[in-house]
Amino acid sequence: MAGEPWVVAYRFEDRLTGGSLVYAPCVAEWTASLDAALTGAGCVVLDGTFFHDDEMLHATGQDRPARTMGHLPIADSCQRLRSHTAARKLYTHLNNTNPALAEDSPERTTLEASGIEVAYDGLALDL
């Protein structure tokens, strides 16, 4: 939509099974258009580049907030993602500074408690 921040999201629908997947690898802000794309999807794979907006500052000393690089932090998108009815919800493209990469981190525990997974290399998704 005109005037909204950049959001890249692709919706795939399997005509044979009726299954659908939304892959949103670049989410600068949660928009009404993104909400509409996710509605009714069976699986959602969302931008999980950073968990916290100030992650780069703490990890590298560089003051580069996640939002200024076009990535809505997981801490700010998790509740919105949780509100959708998809059977599977995953974050992908996690930066090496993202604490949710560690399976024993509080951030990963928060996601898992919300029914949200972290995608991994070799993951196969059925629609």
Please report, for each region that a protein language model flagged, where it lies by residue.
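Short beta-strand scaffold segments in enzyme catalytic cores
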Residues: 8-12
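Beta-strand-turn-beta hairpins that frame and shape the catalytic cleft
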Residues: 14-21, 127
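Short Gly/Pro-enriched turn/cap motifs at secondary-structure boundaries
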Residues: 1-2
